[in-house]
């Protein structure tokens, strides 16, 4: 039986909600490849995708909590790095809006799982909870 400590929730959930955006980032990468194949007939070059993924990971940290924020923050990347035109950009925004709730569910579930892992780590290494104002 795993019990999550309040201090882990207070620390882990806000941290992971801001930096752990697997649902948003993964779906956007897959949608970029799909839209590119459908509209332009080919996938982006592998090195272009590597650059896009790295930059998307950085840009996504600036957009947590905003519905569709990841795709809005990355529009410049989609246009400049991948070379999408207005049609590709519009299709990306439409598809992302349709599935954004599933990406959010993935993000929230992942945040809870990571908080459980953090609790397990603290328990395994005998890390004691410190009350606020208490001196170690």
Write out the residue ranges for each language-model feature.
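Transmembrane alpha-helical segments and their short flanking loops
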Residues: 29-136
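Short, small-residue-biased leader/transition segments that mark boundaries at the very start
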Residues: 2-4
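Short glycine/threonine-rich loop-to-helix capping motif typified by GTGT followed
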Residues: 21-31
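Membrane-water interface at loop-to-transmembrane-helix junctions
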Residues: 7-21
């Amino acid at each position: 039986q795993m019990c999550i400590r309040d201090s882990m929730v207070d620390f882990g959930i806000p941290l992971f909600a801001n930096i752990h955006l697997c649902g948003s980032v993964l779906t956007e990468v897959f949608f970029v490849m799909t839209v590119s194949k459908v509209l332009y007939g080919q996938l982006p070059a592998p090195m272009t995708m590597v650059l896009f993924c790295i930059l998307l990971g950085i840009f996504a940290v600036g957009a947590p909590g905003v519905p569709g924020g990841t795709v809005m923050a990355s529009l410049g990347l989609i246009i400049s790095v991948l070379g999408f035109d207005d049609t590709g950009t519009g299709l990306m925004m439409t598809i992302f809006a349709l599935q954004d709730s599933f990406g959010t569910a993935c993000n929230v579930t992942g945040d809870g799982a990571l908080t459980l892992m953090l609790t397990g780590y603290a328990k395994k290494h005998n890390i004691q909870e410190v009350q606020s104002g208490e001196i170690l």
